[in-house]
């Protein structure tokens, strides 16, 4: 069977995430490997509600949220040139990258 490399990208800023995705896709396409994606995964939104005043006025509150954006890239049947190209890609500081190697047996 074929091996696969799954690349999962996470970021709070969707613009930097899209830029990192474009850089990875272009690096992989230069090695003539087949790539599936970018597949947008569901974003996760965390909301926090806090009181505006520490003493009274319980009804006066403020709400904050954190949005986590995610993308998935799958490289089918990678060769050593793909791994070398991925190691040379320079990404933005706010993008978290998780790379998984999957053996298709």
Swiss-Prot record:
GO molecular function, one term: tRNA binding
Keywords of the record: Ribonucleoprotein, Ribosomal protein
A cellular component term, taken from the record's GO annotations: ribosome
Record bears the keyword Metal-binding: no
UniProt keyword annotation of NAD present: no
Any single biological process term in GO: translation
Subunit structure: Part of the 30S ribosomal subunit.
Family in the record: Belongs to the universal ribosomal protein uS10 family.
Record's function text: Involved in the binding of tRNA to the ribosomes.
Name of the molecule in the record: Small ribosomal subunit protein uS10
Taxonomic lineage from the root: Bacteria, Pseudomonadati, Pseudomonadota, Alphaproteobacteria, Rickettsiales
Originating gene: rpsJ
